[in-house]
UniProtKB/Swiss-Prot annotation:
Organism field: Drosophila melanogaster
EC number(s) from the headed UniProt entry: 2.1.1.357
Low complexity biased stretches: 89-100, 723-733
Gly residues: bias regions: 173-182
This protein's name: Nuclear receptor binding SET domain protein
Keyword Plastid: no
Length: 1427
């Protein structure tokens, strides 16, 4: 006899019941080693050996289980009462106490069952699932099986026997033939006293008088094996009994003859009307082994005579249970493994428990699997719950379910892959020890709007779904009761990133409530079948690039098969069609990926075949049509495919069309290769001349050919996109993955990469990585989103808008969030990629409106366009945009809206609003809004630079005038990219927690005190350090933010993350952010930084960072912690990488400047000075002087002629000069100047360069501009100080004769200052009017910068401007004293001597002598005067 390892046997006292597995295939009786395990425990408890009775007729052991009607125990066995007395005599005092404890527990349970007898739900349901609560003394006995096992350890008392008899299986072998068994049973009943309570328990369905309602169920008997290692450790160690069973072939054959064959699984067990006192007839259980591993695990066990166990099987009058069993098909597991969303099969497990139970002789005992407390649902809408304490769960029930850290999510009760909806799901299925861990009851659900994800949820984590309003009421109650920060309230609030999906799930669940229960499951699967289909269409093109395209491309383009057609028989591989029956193992509610409508096409040999997924023709022509790996690896082929795909698809995604294009492009590629081979062959044969043929082959095989084709297709596509839209398009808005089909798959960035590798990758990024893949479509002026249903306003504004957004604007409803809007998707009726159009005739029932026009809200109400900065018509008077200080006389002019003079703009702005936007120009003659210059490129001189657009376009913020180049190096970090021309800059969407984060020291002097904090960044300064008047009621914007210089991607910054100190970090571009960091919740305009010295990353906003500059060392607070060591390492790394990044950025700036030439701001070009009232020019001809130069001189009135007018700096008047037209002293009037050009000189700004040599004393150019008096000069200086404009063009001639070349002038206004200039200014009198000319003071070679000394004394209120002339004697300040080279050399030599002497001599500190202050060189000290 073989003992297997998968059965279960338990021995309690003298009664033994177990499950023996009979393998009908091998005809061998198998049992489990649990029999041995149970016997070992019994022996360990008793401490004595018990002999197994042997048959007197032969020496073979007695079989444990036999046919019904046969009793392996002889009729002469001693009765149960005598056996009980013998057992009680062998009991120890400890065992008696345990027996008394068990009896007390049983009595308490019977009393509780008696109290529950009055409930009609209890009658007929006294079984293993009855809701009998445990007593305090039995709190450690969790399950039925453990209670039976513990009772087996205490089976030495009569009460233990009674408990064992009560818990015995109704299939315990009865007496043989019915005679002896009846006598034994009647004798036992006659000796047992039954109280009225016990009779009432029997009447209400208890299985025995002492029934506890916790008898072992069928699952406890045959399904889950139990290993008793944990129990053995708690028992007393005694020598184990050696169990051996030996069956010869004769006995084995006899057992096979007497065993009962198992009936079909679907057969119901019949019940008979026999009395409950009759003997129970049992049938051997035959269960087919599922795996061959169980046969291999079977071992032979023999029973030796010296160590035998005595098994006394007593005939008990046991009550049976009527069981109706319906098993699921055997192939259920296979079908559920293959299908993701398989419909539940029409099978169930129903357990009907009735009292009093009977079993007929023909009934079969079959072990069933059911949960210990709640039965398995049938997966057809039935939910059979035997426990009235548990709720009823039905397929299609809607709940709010909570798993892990997610909030409560709408879900629906669905069957799991095994067909269960309720069951025990142990947290540790591999655990085999018998500890006291509780196994929870869980319900299987699937979640809405979550791609059909499923999970098992505990009932306490389920809430009944009654709509969103009821959920909000419940959540509000929890908030009032526990507070908004409590865990109970937070688990009912979804995260910000999940709100949209959460509301979508609520909508789906709400729609499911309108569907009957019988159709909910099918509807659920249909919904997510569409989701799976859409996800399949969004796969990357590289996944199906190498797939066969014969089913689509070849069927539509049969003529292309003749390119590589070969003779021969064509094979047809036909696949078996998938069954459409929902009960079939191969059924799937989700259509197969290759399942399409079969098409009829003719093969080349004239036969017809079906092509498609079900029957696919594999032909040589189709095989060669498919793109092979060699062709796809060719870059020319990839470029050709990308160009054609972009031209045809137009940012759409259609798997069918793309497969067709792949087939067509492959055929075009094959044709081109054939033509190239023919050209090469003709060239080799000499039919074509070699120079011509080589050039043709070279041009045809180069990548430039594909590039030219791509440019032409791109031009055609742009022209087509610029055509006016008559009707809204029905194509859906492309999603982000669809637009990036041409991109290579992104590689996941690991978190713990070295910082050197990260910075190297950042420096290698191109200038367009932020704009790659963005849409070029316009966006709505209200919701800032693109879409296929955009319509242009029919009025003058010509803005784009959605119809529903216009309705929201009119009604005041909130606009949809960016990214949440879905395009209108109208399913096409044809398979062509072009949208369908309805054919309208005169007899059509409905009139189709063509060209529906919309008018935006502002145009409709006649509201004038407001300021581009404050978005208001009248100038605001708020602290964020204060008025100018001098507002007494010029308030009406400054409050007026100025219109931008740039072409194709027309934006209007207030002069007062330009205070924080220095990129704008508020000049009356040339007003310019801040949206025409890149704020990053002109940040060092916002008001003095103006960059011509050229080929570099601009991306503009939709909420403010911020404008940047369409280059990744110019876009600030955290910018929200809407499309290629519209962005949302980081100034917006600032969280409340980041609104007031500033440093505690002055950014200029690095000291504390009373600070003025910037409103847009963490910088704080002292008011006296900034040297500007700041009112208490107005906000302060620092110079960095005002100039538009925001932190960029790849720059090093100081970052304040949570409560940590300011830490050096680098801003990571979006392409370098690790994938796990991307999944973290963050704000709309946040960006990721990596902290130096660590591998930590974090999302952070603009308000928590400021630029790291050279020389920063951090705070000096030193500790010995690991955090401080990481901080020190981070500061060192930041200081080491800062010059590398700055050098790389300077190289990029030089490359950009070489491509896009910078130009100064526009100005009015004039030739002569213009007087500004009240100043006027007056000519007095009496003051004219004449010279003595004659026309016969070599150079009349020249520099060497000794002309009197030239020596007096007067220009000769042609009417009075004797030289006439030959006079050379007419530079100003004739404007004789060399060829000059304005060039950008980096940190020096714009400068003037000569393009031809200039000799010493030559006239260069006249300095012209507006001539103003001193009062006007003071007013303009104050205006420049308010505007923070440090570009001065004033040249003072006299007190009331000052030339201002700022608004009007010529090229002389671009000449820079130099401490060692090559030109100088001279005041000349021309026709009795003072004019200023610039003359060379040295020979100037070609391409040299022309400079002169500004001679500023006190122009900027005792403040000096830095000088960048680079001269040897440069003072460092404009207008400062020059440094003497000799003095500097002498000081350096003296310092070297002192250093050398200090090495050999010891210095003694000299006594301090009082210093005498000399007022002048002629003054003497006071001591000398006294003497």
């Amino acid at each position: 006899m073989k003992l297997s390892t998968d059965a279960h046997s338990e021995i309690e006292g003298d009664a033994a019941h177990g499950n023996v597995l009979c393998n009908s295939a091998s005809d061998s009786l198998t049992a489990t080693d649990e029999v041995a395990a149970g016997n070992d425990e019994s022996v360990a408890t008793e401490g004595d050996d018990v002999e197994i009775p042997r048959d007197t007729n032969n020496s073979t052991p007695v079989r444990l289980l036999d046919k019904p009607g046969q009793n392996p125990v002889q009729n002469g066995a001693q009765p149960a009462a005598e056996e009980s007395e013998l057992e009680s005599q062998r009991q120890t005092p400890v065992q008696k106490q345990q027996q008394q404890r068990v009896s007390m527990v049983n009595r308490k349970r019977d009393l509780i069952n008696l109290q529950s007898a009055l409930s009609p739900k209890y009658i007929g349901y006294a079984n293993a699932n009855s809701p009998t609560p445990l007593s305090d003394s039995d709190d450690t006995i969790r399950t039925t099986r453990r209670r039976v096992n513990q009772a087996a350890a205490l089976n030495n008392s009569s009460a233990g026997e009674t408990l064992a008899h009560d818990n015995a299986s109704p299939r315990t072998p009865g007496g043989g033939g019915g005679g002896g068994g009846d006598d034994s049973a009647n004798q036992l009943l006659s000796k047992t006293y039954m109280s009225p309570i016990e009779k009432l328990l029997i009447k209400n369905g208890a299985s025995s008088p002492n029934s506890t309602g916790f008898e072992a169920g069928s699952e406890d008997l045959g399904i889950r094996p139990i290993v008793r290692k944990h129990v053995k450790r708690k028992m007393k160690r005694v020598p184990k009994a050696k169990v051996t069973l030996e069956l010869d072939e004769k006995n084995q054959q006899e057992v096979d003859e007497k065993s009962v064959k198992t009936e079909p699984i679907d057969e119901e067990v019949d019940r008979t009307d026999e009395a409950p006192t009759q003997e129970a007839q049992t049938t051997a259980i035959s269960i087919k082994s599922e795996t061959e591993a169980e046969h291999k695990a079977a071992v032979d066990v023999h029973i030796k005579q010296e160590d035998t166990i005595r098994l006394d099987i007593v005939n008990n009058p046991v009550e049976s249970t009527s069981i109706v069993i319906t098993e699921e098909p055997k192939d259920l597991e296979k079908s559920t493994e293959e299908l993701a969303f398989a419909l539940p099969l029409a099978s169930s497990t129903e357990v009907d428990l009735k009292s009093p139970p009977d079993l007929s002789s023909t009934a079969l005992a079959t072990s069933i699997k059911s949960p210990s407390s709640v039965s398995i649902d049938s997966a057809k809408g039935l939910s059979i719950v035997t426990d009235p304490g548990w709720p009823t769960y039905q397929v299609g029930d809607l709940f709010w379910g909570k798993v892990f850290s997610y909030c409560f999510w709408p879900c629906m009760v669905c069957p799991d892959p095994l067909g269960q909806i309720v069951g025990n799901m142990p947290s540790h299925p591999q655990r085999s020890s018998l500890d006291n861990a509780n196994v929870p009851i869980q319900v299987h659900v699937r979640f809405f709007a979550d791609n059909g994800r499923r999970n098992w949820i505990k009932p306490e984590n389920l809430l009944t779904f009654a709509g969103l309003k009821a959920f909000d009421d419940m959540r509000e109650e929890l908030r009032i009761k526990h507070g908004p920060k409590s865990a109970k309230y937070r688990q009912m609030v979804p995260k910000r990133t999940k709100v949209v999906i959460w509301r979508q799930a609520i909508e789906e669940a709400q729609a499911m409530t309108q569907i009957p229960y019988s159709d909910r499951l099918e509807k659920f699967y249909q919904t997510y079948e569409n989701v799976v289909t859409l996800n399949r269409q969004k796969r990357k093109r590289t996944k199906y690039m190498m797939q066969d395209t014969s089913d689509v491309g070849s069927s539509l383009y049969d003529s292309t098969d003749n390119l590589h057609n070969k003779q021969g028989t064509q094979l047809l591989a036909v696949k078996r069609e998938r069954s459409e029956s929902p009960f079939s193992p191969a059924f799937s509610p989700v259509k197969s990926k290759n399942e399409k409508r079969a098409k009829r096409r003719k093969l080349s040999n004239g036969t017809e075949a079906d092509t498609g997924s079900n029957s696919m023709a594999v032909t040589p022509s189709q095989t060669e049509t498919t793109v092979d790996s060699s062709a796809y690896e060719n870059p020319e082929f990839r470029q050709l495919l990308s160009a054609v795909m972009e031209y045809v698809m137009m940012n759409r995604s259609d798997e069918k069309v793309e497969k067709v294009l792949l087939s067509v492009v492959s055929n075009i590629w094959s044709l081109k290769q054939i033509q190239l081979r023919e050209l090469e062959r003709d060239l080799a044969s000499g039919e074509i001349e070699e120079p011509l043929g080589s050039s043709v082959v070279g041009r045809g095989s180069g990548v430039g050919t594909i590039k030219r084709l791509s440019n032409r297709l791109m031009t055609m596509m742009v022209r087509r996109s610029m055509t006016p839209v008559v009707t809204p398009s029905t194509t859906p808005a492309p999603s982000e993955p669809d637009r990036r089909l041409s991109e290579p798959p992104k590689t996941k960035k690991p978190v713990n990469r070295p910082i050197e590798e990260v910075i190297e990758d950042i420096l290698q990024l191109d200038s367009k990585y932020l704009f790659r893949g963005l849409s070029r479509e316009p966006i709505c002026k209200y919701c800032y989103q693109a879409g296929s249903d955009l319509v242009r306003c029919s009025r003058t504004c010509s803005s784009w808008l959605h119809a529903d957004c216009l309705e929201r604007k009119v009604t005041g409803a909130p606009m949809p969030k960016i990214g949440s809007r879905k395009a209108l998707v109208i399913p096409p009726t044809s398979k062509s990629p072009s949208p369908d159009e309805d054919h309208v005739t005169a007899d059509a029932k409905e009139v189709v409106a063509v060209g529906t026009s919309l008018v935006c809200h502002e145009c409709n109400v006649g509201e004038p366009e407001g300021c581009v900065i404050c978005h208001q018509v009248e100038s605001p008077a708020v602290p964020s945009t204060p008025r100018k200080e001098d507002s007494s006389s010029h308030t009406p002019i400054e409050d007026k809206l100025l219109t931008c003079s740039q072409p194709m703009c027309g934006k209007r702005f207030h002069t007062s609003c330009c205070k924080y936007w220095p990129q704008a120009s508020s000049s009356k003659h040339s007003a310019r809004c801040p949206r025409h210059v890149c704020h990053t490129c002109v940040s060092d001189d916002p008001s003095g630079k103006f960059q011509q657009l050229g080929s570099s376009k601009l991306a503009k913020c939709v909420r403010c005038p911020a404008t940047y180049h369409q280059l990744s190096k110019c876009i600030p970090a955290g910018t929200q990219m809407l499309n290629t021309t519209n962005i949302i800059c980081p100034r917006h969407n600032i969280a409340k927690a980041d609104a007031h984060v500033n440093v505690l020291w002055c950014y200029i002097c690095v000291k504390g005190g009373e600070l003025v904090c910037c409103e847009t960044c963490p910088i704080a300064v002292h008011a006296h350090c900034r040297n500007i008047p700041i009112k208490t009621n107005e906000s302060y914007i620092c110079e960095e933010c005002e100039s538009g210089r925001l932190p960029l991607y790849g720059e090093i910054v100081w970052a304040k993350f949570n409560n940590f100190r300011w830490w050096p970090a680098i801003i990571l571009p979006p392409t370098e952010v690790p994938s796990n960091i991307l999944k973290k919740a963050h704000g709309e305009n946040d960006f990721v930084v990596r902290f130096f010295g660590t591998h930590d990353h974090g999302w952070i906003s603009r308000r928590r960072v400021y630029l790291y500059i050279e020389g920063d060392t951090g705070d000096g607070h030193k500790t010995k912690s690991q955090l401080f060591r990481n901080y020190t390492t981070g500061v060192e790394e930041a200081s080491r990488f800062l010059p590398i990044i700055k050098a790389r950025r300077q190289e990029q700036d030089m490359e950009r400047q070489s491509g896009n030439k910078l130009h100064p701001p526009p100005y009015v070009k004039i030739k002569t000075n213009k007087a500004v009232p009240p100043l006027r020019f007056s000519q007095n001809l009496e003051d004219l002087s004449t010279c003595n130069c004659l026309p016969v001189d070599e150079h009349p009135c020249g520099p060497e002629a000794g002309c009197l007018n030239r020596m007096l700096f007067n220009e000769c008047n042609p009417e009075y000069c004797k030289a006439g037209s030959l006079c050379e002293n007419r530079m100003f009037e004739q404007r004789k100047s060399p060829r000059l050009e304005v060039v950008y000189m980096n940190e020096r700004g714009f400068g003037l360069v000569n393009r031809e040599p200039i000799a010493v004393g030559d006239f260069v150019i006249e300095y012209v501009g507006e001539v103003i008096n001193h009062a006007e000069f003071q007013r303009r200086m104050e205006q420049k100080q308010r505007d923070r404009d440090e570009n001065y063009y004033f040249l003072g001639v006299e007190k009331d004769f000052i030339i201002d070349a700022g608004p009007k002038g010529n090229l002389a206004r671009f000449m820079n200052h130099s401490c060692e200039p090559n030109c100088e200014t001279q005041k000349w009198t021309v026709n009795c009017i003072h004019r200023v000319g610039i003359f060379a003071i040295k020979d100037i070679p070609v391409n040299s910068e022309l400079t002169f000394n500004y001679l500023w004394d006190d122009l900027m209120n005792n403040s000096k401007k830095a000088c960048f002339c680079g001269a040897k004697r440069c003072s460092g300040e404009i207008g400062g004293k020059l440094k003497d080279d000799a003095v500097k050399a002498h000081a350096k030599l003296k310092q070297m001597r002192r250093a050398k002497a200090s090495a050999v001599r010891i210095h003694v500190k000299p006594k301090k002598t009082p210093k005498v202050k000399h007022i002048s060189a002629d003054d003497e000290p006071m001591d000398a005067k006294d003497e």
